[in-house]
Amino acid sequence: VSGGLLLRSAPAAALMTDSTARFSAYLEITPTGRIRITSPQSEMGQGIHDALAKILAEELEADWADVEIALPTADDALINPITRRHRTAASESVVIYRDVMRRMGASAREMLVQAAADRWQVAASECHAERSAVRHRASGRQLGFGALAVPAAVLPVPQNPALKSPADYRLVGRTTPRKDTPPKVTGQAVYGIDVQLPGMLYAALRRSPVVASRIKTFDREAALARSGVVDAFEVDEGIAIVASSTWLAWQVAKEISVEFDEAPAEGFESEALRKAMRTALDADNEARLGRALSGPAYDRDATLAALSSAPRQAEWIYEVPFLAHAALEPLCATAVVHADRAEVWAPTQQPDRCRDAIAAITGLPRERCTLHVTFLGGGFGRKWETDFVRQTVTIARELARKRPGTPVKLTWTREQDFLHDRFRPAHVARSRAGVSDDGRLLALHSRVTGPSIFTFQKRNLPPGVADPFATGLLINDFYRVPAR
């Protein structure tokens, strides 16, 4: 949909090229009264599309039957207002976007009410919005949102729109049919693996079974000799086979002769890591949580003293192994690279980082790189990583040297999805508690050892500050403990 008005703090010129009013990056209203709400977050089965759309529709006073929900693109207008990033993770979507969606809906509602009042030449205070229409109380007249959207979009945007009282909610907190159920049941929902484009080719990767191993040699001529194989070449993490079907690409990638070098990870054993983590529980070095806790400050020496003096003591150890995310939809993406632009379709949890990667790989300006977020067939944090998108764009870039503008879809096999997962780290956690005779918790000391996600993702933490993903809620503000 083209045309529109971005919600901002001052009036702006409406850009209407097809009579659809774009009130913001989140909201469009068509002349027929269809209310199109773009969810900024990736939908991977958790229901966030309906949740965020309901919040906006509630303030807009929309009839839920008139609402349709659009999948997002990588758009700076949709970034997380607190972290200033466009991502879906940590169960934070409603917390982060609730106020934004409320303001978007409330501002558009007041603009629609004002447009109706102007048409009827009455005061806006005499009108109210209800079920996708604006009504004039005294005369009983009403106009649907579709008839008012275009004139409303040229009005000044309210600085502080009135928000509804939760007591007046009709949608939020109420059970309504999920908008994504019919397309999923009928097979019309487009997941990353479903993307089909005219003239599309299909790619597979051959990778070493050992992490960080590189290609020494491979039989490219044998791969190209297979009927239906279009190209074969090395990429950063293996060999790409481009063919006329995914199945053919998979088979050729599996069958070609490849020699890998020796990887740094060869010889790695889970039991050795487990012993190292157990040993680290008693090491002298200790990183602390990097945020202040309410209540008594964290004091290691005082906590250990309180433990030793407590009438009763308890200790427990938990261990978890490396764990694959095992999303139902294997990793996949589709990309097409032109001389002046690139376009990608991906089931990703991090649209902004993917868009940055597209620009870096193709050398194109970021504004010439488009990323469409599809439905995700599960994510669980694995599709937070961008490796599969980077691989796809790299293949599309190489393909464009000979076949510019040819789309290509990369699909990992199920085996690769498990073997080359970005595994949830193995960890060992030990907690020691001091308890009073009447069962009150007097002291709590916890230590966690294991690989750091922050270090893996190259997020620099100050020396001595613990990775919050490792500690999680092990130490939290929810319970008051005198010494911890």
Where do the protein language model's features map onto the residues?
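Structural alpha/beta core scaffold segments of enzyme domains
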Residues: 1-484
